[in-house]
Amino acid sequence: MDLEPWGPLYRKQDQDGSLDNIAVVSGDIPSPHPKNEPSQTSTLHIPRDSDLDSDIPSVPTALIIAWGLTLSSLTGDEVVGFDLLPFRGDYQDLGARPYHFLLKFGYREWSREAATTGMDLGSASSEGLPQGMGNRPQIAPSRFRNVLIIKQCSDAPGDSGSLESPSLGNVDKDEPTDAFRADMFISIQCGIGRTGIDVHCSFDPAFWTSENIRMILLDLSRNFKEVMRCGRDDTPLTCLEGMSPKGLDCVLRRNIIPPPPKMEACVHHRFQARCRQNPSALAIDAWDGQLTYAELDSLSSQLASRLVSSITICPRGFMGVLMEKSAWVPVAILAVLKVGSAFVFLDGSQPLQRLKIICAETKSQLVLSSAHYREKANTLGPPVLLVEKNQSGLGQAKENDSCPSLLEDYPQPQSQPQDTLYAVFTSGSTGEPKGAMVDHGAFCTMCGPQMAARPTTNVSPRVFQFAPHAFTVSILDYLGTLLQGGCVCVPSEEELRNNMAGAIEGLSANIVTMTPSMARVLDPTQTPSLQLVLLAGEMMAQCDLDKWSQCVRLLSLYGQSENAAGSMISEKSIVPRAPNTFETLTPGFQCWIVSQDNPHRLMALGEVGELLLEGPALGQGYMNDPIQTEDKFICRSFCLEYAHSGSPQSYRLFKTGDLVRYTPAGEIELLGRKGAEVKLRGQRIDLTEIEHHLRCLFPSATRVVADVIIPSDDIDGLHPVLAAFVQVDSVSRTGQSAEATFASPRPEFRAEAKAVLSGLCQTIPSYMIPMTIIPTEAFPFTATGKLDRRSLRQYASAMSRSDLLKYVTDDRGPVVTAVTPVEIIIHDACVEALGVSSDKVGMLDSFPDLGGDSLAARRMVSICRTKGLELAVADILAHSSLTSLAEKCSAGGGGAKQISQGVEMLDPFSTAKEEFLSHLPSFLPNADMIADVFPVQGAQRRAARAIDTFIFRLSGPVDADRLRDACQVLQQAHLALRSIFVPFYGKFMQVVLRVPPLDFTRRLLPDGTDLVKWAESIGQADKTQRPPSEEFVVRFTLAETAGTPDYSIFMMRLSHAQYDAGCLARIISDLWAVYEQKQLVVKSDFAQYARRAVQQTHLLSMEAFWRDLLAGTTGLTPLPVTGISAEEERTIIVQQRVELKEPPPTGISMATVVRGAWSWVLHQQTGNTVVVFNEMLNGRDVVPLEDTEPVVGACHSIVPVCVHFPLPQSGRTPRELLSALQEQHLASLTFTTLDRDYLIQNCTEWTSHQSGFILAYQNFPEICDLVIGEDLSCQWASQVLDLAEPGEAWVTATPLPGALQISLRVSTAAMDEQEANAWISALGQTIIRFLDSPDSVL
């Protein structure tokens, strides 16, 4: 037989002849297993035929090649390694040590002519080889240790002699390997005899089953025959199509259950069926509101009506949804579906150019946008329709600030199950994102079986909506949960960034799907409400199992954008399993493992191949890309014709690009991805898209490569980074090399690399932007001339994170160590979040320059929180160094919580409390009545005598006893609501009663009584005849008339020292939640808030800030004086609605716009060169507490704002004025807990406590209309407030959709109604001017 094509390659090993002369040895061979190590054997006989007769000396050569091919199929590698034992007749002289071989296969492109360059048998040797035979390489491609033994037998026919395994001598059995464990040992012993070849395999049963080994031997036999045929017939050596019948039966048994038929249903129809089953069940529980199934159905129908009336809808077209996480996202989705369209999520965090491409690809007819993204939506091209919340708490669509009434009746198109439901855009190879489409029927088919695998324990599913809108899981969170009758729990974007654990607990979520990277950020002990955690999007690690499997039910989910929901799922809590194995197929799929290069060839058990999915839940394909759709979605596979013989139906198949294999236990093990697609922190990235944009920005580059690497100092290997490699003329080296060579960092290249990274930010999402760009002198290539990505990754991974960053960041100074307690916490958290060694992080480094991204910042926030330090993601990413971040914390920013916890045991009120308890007032007979005592602080003191009344309309029957019980529970739950305010030696003390009295009255009024006016009169009487503050003022009243039993009024009277506008909505919602027999969860109370605020006040240096700000001032800007008598004085209120056409300038809040406009009006109206006024702020923003819900209590503070006129040269435009005020506001936030009286006495030269104007920007939670049960609703009716003190004037601004409501409450002793209207009009005009012309000269 002529095997000449392989001859020259073998001769690289030995110059004196062919391998045929050295690959055969006679004699007995001892066993390879160390003493006492268990092993099992399996045998196979390859019978003698014409091949063996033709060229017996070449048989050993063919066996070596066949074993290499078998290993390549088993591992999926083109480079495989094994030990060949023994080699010559002088075997004993070699000390029984094997030759180590590396076979480099190019067999996927093999032909007889290419074979000489497609293999290289001479690239490795063991240490026992004679000199000149080559050196062992630095990296061993063997995925498990294995040895091939070939022996010529001269025994009787059919007897190959004693084929026991040889001794391995001192071969290092624990040598590190590429992916598999080193002790996964196999020994293949081939005895060439007269009747054929007897193959004996010794293997470790701990890692291999007999069935797996049997399949391996069958592969070896088939490969051997194919190699012999190739040499004999002078034909190409192909990919060896075909499988033995036994092997095929084993594979088919893995898919014995066929997928179900495709469901003929539409998503919105199934949702409406859910609504009919349980209309009052809670569907959405979001940070901005709650919706029942009936409300969600009604609101989406209203919005659908608006869509129909706004544009001419093209049937089965697309509409974009550009909204932050909100209760209104599912309203928008369902509205789009109800008008017969499909939707595509537009993630507002992605670059504008990418969103424009998505809109163009989908030919979006309309973009449904929130007010937050209105400006961005208007630049995308399609018409924009705003979806937002109106004052009454219902949803409405709004276009061009016009709000026509919405009707639920509209022409409904006949949607079909085969219609597209949604499109999801992922990274694409052409430089632009590719859109995968899924139809209604596919989603409905998977939704039932898929969600059935996500049960909780004895409670209704409450699914936490974590995934960004750009990813498929977010659609499963919304629609999948709704179709199952569960509740979608929607956090705010800010909560996700800074306190995800708090958001989960605040919403009482019990299910979440997230990436393993995100799961590593959370602490299971901080999320006790979670019962089921699904990890998806990337490979799990053992640490993920160790962390979560004992705390929750842990599932691993596998799926892709090209199919609905997931296709494989694995239980990780009940049965111990490897992290990346899947034992269960979801009922909508069958899985097949095929050759990476030939989808028509099935792989045997244990062999590595590409995963193919088959089933009714596959998507429709790629939008506007028939070529790629045809490539990835296979209509027919020859290898499955036998599998489907007699089957009633078969489906298309999808080539996933994921490399997998069957484990010995029969599970599917996920090994990685083939080609240029990678997974990084749950994001699927096509590297060629990044390379496309790099080429555009690096025109001088001759070669550009992007890949994922693991820095050498990544301790646990869980923090891979994306790196780019560019070869430019200035650093290139001619010719091809087997090694990668990188240039040194230079300032010129660093500047160019920074510019390129900045340019990438404008075109691709942040998760696709490389952390570094490395100038590469030479790229490594394989023997076949291909780019060797594996070697490139390995060479780059030899660099540390700091080495990689030197190419894109300025030269690093000395590593400065942490000194203070706060610095040590920040330093250690940064080290842990980035997964680097401690000496790599210095306090002068910035977090982004260390390679930190937003996910790592979240991890750092979580770590700091466990150590008592509160930080925000934005702070971590914004600060120029860890030192400046620590200084901010030490100055009272995020570090306030950590510092105060250090003295948590020292109660700042202990002295005052002891003094009060030792001198109890007579109306408090004993201390047992008292739960707590502490001094009233700041703005709360001025509100201790104010009595406010709130009035609500109730429609429907009310159970008065249940309402009375609910009032009692509410009062007991919130500490502030069981407090009285007692004068004590010139100050007020807040006394918390253990069991307060319940003042609940039910009034039956004469028919015809105007209940609202009656309630207002009661409130006015309470305001005029204020009860003493030491009396318990909380009172609840239910009033009704005999003639209208289903209509009543509910009144609630509170002291303004017990609440503020920031918690009023919570008080109302908690009351009716208790009425519906729901359990209240109160994690933080007002006593904790008061103590924490005082601790910050005493620990932080506040006085210097206020002294500097108020230096030279003599007091608040005084109110004007009209001169009327006290008898004629009255309070007037004027207000105006300001329509807003432009958003605030970048970086400026709307509150700052109002603040700046009011300071300008004061300057213009009074002519004062210095204006000083008070502003009411929400103290909850600066006092960290555990509860994500607003603490019930008077947490507001009143602080001065000071502006000097005329403005300096650098501040003569509105933009500059607003920037200065924004900086003043941000700087003052950490100092707002200082008591106002103390501030005036110790930080100013003011002679008296003057009154003046108080500005309040009332961006507080809205009191929404509530639906209680099936037939009771609660609506806001009126209020009677007791706010102003003599000499005060209140200026308020309340944000509305597209507008501001501004008002002025002032005494006629300061101005008459005409003057008040002039002032408020001036404020409105100034706000518009500042927004429309921020760069005009003042």
UniProtKB/Swiss-Prot annotation:
Protein name according to UniProt: Nonribosomal peptide synthetase astA
Region: Disordered, residue numbers: 22-52
Entry keyword Kinase: no
Ligase recorded as keyword: yes
SUPFAM superfamilies per the UniProt record, alphabetical: Acetyl-CoA synthetase-like (SSF56801), ACP-like (SSF47336), CoA-dependent acyltransferases (SSF52777)
Pathway(s) of this molecule: Secondary metabolite biosynthesis; terpenoid biosynthesis
A GO CC term attached to the entry: cytoplasm
Gene3D superfamilies from the UniProt entry: 3.30.300.30, ACP-like, Chloramphenicol acetyltransferase-like domain, N-terminal domain of ligase-like, Nonribosomal peptide synthetase, condensation domain
GO terms for MF: ligase activity; phosphopantetheine binding
Domain remarks: NRP synthetases are composed of discrete domains (adenylation (A), thiolation (T) or peptidyl carrier protein (PCP) and condensation (C) domains) which when grouped together are referred to as a single module. Each module is responsible for the recognition (via the A domain) and incorporation of a single amino acid into the growing peptide product. Thus, an NRP synthetase is generally composed of one or more modules and can terminate in a thioesterase domain (TE) that releases the newly synthesized peptide from the enzyme.
PTM annotation (O-(pantetheine 4'-phosphoryl)serine): residues: 854
Family as reported in the entry's similarity comment: Belongs to the NRP synthetase family.
E.C. number(s) listed in UniProt: 6.3.2.-
Induction: Expression is regulated by the secondary metabolite regulator cclA.
Function: Nonribosomal peptide synthetase; part of the gene cluster that mediates the biosynthesis of astellolides, drimane-type sesquiterpene esters that show antimicrobial, anti-inflammatory, and anti-tumor activities. The first step in astellolide biosynthesis is performed by the sesquiterpene cyclase astC that catalyzes the formation of drimanyl pyrophosphate from farnesyl pyrophosphate. Drimanyl pyrophosphate is then dephosphorylated by the sesquiterpene phosphatase astI to produce drimanyl monophosphate which is further dephosphorylated to drim-8-ene-11-ol by atsK.
Keyword tags: Ligase, Phosphopantetheine, Phosphoprotein
